[in-house]
Amino acid sequence: MAKLTKRMRTIREKVDATKQYDINEAVVLLKELATAKFVESVDVAVNLGIDARKSDQNVRGATVLPHGTGRSVRVAVFTQGANAEAAKAAGAELVGMEDLAELVKKGEMDFDVVIASPDAMRVVGQLGQILGPRGLMPNPKVGTVTPNVAEAVQNAKAGQVRYRNDKNGIIHTTIGKVDFDADKLKENLEALLVALKKGKPSSAKGIYIKKVSLSTTMGAGVAIDQSGLNASA
C-alpha cells in the first residue's frame, strides 16, 4: 500500500467521510486544510439525479454568483460595429472578427472566456477544433452567443460560472476562494443550486440534487448538509 502523505493523513483525521457538514462548519474545515502556498479555490461537486446518457436529461447553463469567484477573468469578444465599441466599454480585453480569429489560429489565446454576437458565428465556427477542446466555444445555452455582448462581458467579469454535467451526472464548478468568509461562500453555493433547480430537466425523476460536496484545489471533498441552505428555486 502506498504511504500516505502528511497532508492526506491530516485530511483523513479531520474529515469524517460519513458525515454531512453544516456549511459554516465545512468552510472552517476547508480553511484548516488549505495549506497550499497560493489562495486555493473552493470547488463544488453536485451529484444530480439524472441519466446522463439521455440527451434530454443533460444539464448545462450559467449563473452569476453574487460574490463572484475571486478570479480576474480576461474576455475575448467576436463582434463588430457598435457591438464592438460596447464590448470594449464593458471591459473586454480583446475584440475583433477575422483579426481575432487569426490570433486564435496562431495559438495566441490570452483569455478565459469567449463571447460572440450571432453575426460573428460564421467566423467563430471555423475555430471549433481549437476552442471546443478548451471549453471556450461560445454557446447560446450559457449566454456566450448573444446580441447583447456588453451584458455578457459584464456577467463574465462579475463572476459568472458556466456548468455542464459530466458522464456521471455530476456538475463541477468553482464558487469562490478559500479566503472568502463563510456567508459569501454559502450565498454563492445557494445561487448555483437555485440555477441548477431552475434548469431541472422535465424528464428527470426522483431526488434531483442528490449530494453536494465542497473541496479546495488541493483538498479532500466535504459533504454538505443541504437542509442548512436556502436554495429554493
From Swiss-Prot:
PROSITE patterns: RIBOSOMAL_L1 (PS01199). One of its GO terms (cellular component) is cytosolic large ribosomal subunit. It comes from the Bacteria. It holds the Pfam family Ribosomal_L1. Gene3D superfamilies: 3.30.190.20, 3.40.50.790. InterPro entries: Ribosom_uL1_bac-type (IPR005878), Ribosomal_uL1 (IPR002143), Ribosomal_uL1-like (IPR023674), Ribosomal_uL1/biogenesis (IPR028364), Ribosomal_uL1_3-a/b-sand (IPR016095), Ribosomal_uL1_CS (IPR023673). One of its GO terms (molecular function) is rRNA binding. Keywords: Repressor, Ribonucleoprotein, Ribosomal protein, RNA-binding, rRNA-binding, Translation regulation, tRNA-binding. One of its GO terms (biological process) is regulation of translation. Belongs to the universal ribosomal protein uL1 family. Binds directly to 23S rRNA. The L1 stalk is quite mobile in the ribosome, and is involved in E site tRNA release. Protein L1 is also a translational repressor protein, it controls the translation of the L11 operon by binding to its mRNA. Part of the 50S ribosomal subunit. PANTHER family: 54S RIBOSOMAL PROTEIN L1, MITOCHONDRIAL, LARGE RIBOSOMAL SUBUNIT PROTEIN UL1M. This is Large ribosomal subunit protein uL1.
